[in-house]
């Protein structure tokens, strides 16, 4: 068996850059199979504002991937038993891949990692396109093309099932293949902490940055930094994580959440709402009632409770270190290890 990784384009400041380096090695070690990466080449580093990719460039990238896949079929390189892993399941080329395999009589398997789509009202597709028939039918068709549909959280599976049909036999809740993160931030652990609170998310409506900005005005004794406003390198970003006591979220969209995990790895307290994927992933010590930040109006009503919670975290920081360690261990095992993913691919 050859495992073909149909990858998502890499953005230097996103985990997609690390997947380029680590995923092929991890997959090969776990399966002992030949691993081939199908890349679309270089891609614009300037993402569409508020998004994690470039809406034009991503289609150029996917088209180049499809050309390579088609050429390999024409040259007879794709064989029975081969496995195609799409690291972003929202990739229409999977339909053409299934088309070629079926018509040419090549018995392959296909898996895809779902990140978001129109079925999430807070995603770009959900906000701008919504439940337009073309996008819902496209997503259902892509889902059906995959033998294995991988989701990182039960919340994401439930969200998907609210708008689209789910087949439990081809739907898997697995950790994302990010075990490389566990030790990659070791050099930033143990840094001197300062009264720093970070907003590590994209600047997008569903991240509710206005709440963070308002908190800055009401808690002048602490330093508040919006990371994406700083044009940070990965090293500079991780330095801030290492110095921060708290990572704050009021997100309205989250199907996994990597930044709060990275923060916890270097002993930054995650303060997250009890909603979305956070509900199943976060320990009770780090969750606050969802109503506090369900929207800006509710935030204003509960501002006193939010600020009181932040002050407790900041002033009693060391009391939470044991719980942070428990949180990290849980996330390492259940959400940021690809072992179950590799097992599904290996059959």
Question: Each predicted region: which residue ranges?
Answer:
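N-terminal pre-catalytic "stem/leader" segment of glycosyltransferase-like enzymes
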Residues: 1-96
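Donor nucleotide-sugar binding/catalytic pocket of nucleotide-sugar-dependent glycosyltransferases
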Residues: 144-186
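Short hydrophobic beta-strand element within catalytic cores of glycosyltransferases
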Residues: 269-272, 279
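A charged, aromatic-enriched C-terminal amphipathic alpha-helix characteristic of glycosyltransferases
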Residues: 293-347
């Amino acid at each position: 068996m050859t495992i073909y990784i149909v990858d998502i384009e890499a953005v230097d400041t996103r985990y997609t850059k690390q997947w380029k380096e680590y995923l092929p090695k991890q997959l090969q070690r776990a399966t002992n199979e030949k691993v081939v990466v199908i890349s679309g080449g270089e891609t614009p580093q300037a993402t569409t504002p508020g998004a994690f990719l470039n809406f034009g460039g991503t289609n150029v990238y996917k088209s180049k991937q499809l050309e390579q896949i088609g050429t390999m079929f024409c040259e007879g390189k794709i064989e029975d038993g081969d496995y195609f892993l799409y690291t972003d399941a929202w990739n229409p080329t999977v339909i053409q891949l299934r088309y070629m395999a079926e018509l040419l009589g090549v018995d392959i398997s296909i898996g895809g990692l779902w990140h978001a789509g129109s079925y999430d009202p807070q995603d770009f597709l959900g906000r701008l396109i919504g439940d337009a028939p073309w996008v819902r039918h496209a997503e259902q068709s892509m889902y059906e093309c995959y033998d294995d549909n991988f989701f990182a959280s039960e919340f994401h599976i439930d969200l998907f099932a609210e708008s689209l049909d789910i087949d439990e036999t081809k739907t898997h809740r697995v950790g994302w293949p990010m075990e490389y993160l566990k030790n990659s931030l070791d050099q930033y652990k143990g840094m001197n902490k300062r009264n720093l609170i970070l907003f590590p998310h994209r600047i997008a409506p569903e991240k509710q940055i206005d709440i963070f900005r308002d908190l800055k005005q009401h808690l002048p004794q602490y330093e508040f930094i919006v990371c994406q406003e700083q044009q940070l390198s990965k090293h500079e970003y991780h330095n801030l994580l290492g110095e921060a006591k708290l990572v704050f979220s009021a997100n309205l969209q989250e199907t996994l959440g990597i930044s709060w995990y990275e923060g916890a790895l270097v002993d930054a307290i995650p303060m997250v709402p009890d909603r979305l994927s956070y509900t199943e992933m976060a320990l009770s010590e780090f969750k606050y009632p969802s109503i506090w930040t369900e929207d800006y109006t509710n935030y204003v009503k509960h501002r006193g409770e939010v600020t009181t919670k932040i002050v407790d975290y900041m002033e009693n920081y060391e009391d939470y270190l044991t719980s942070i360690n428990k949180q990290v261990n849980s996330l390492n095992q259940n959400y940021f290890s690809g072992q179950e993913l590799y097992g599904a691919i290996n059959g």
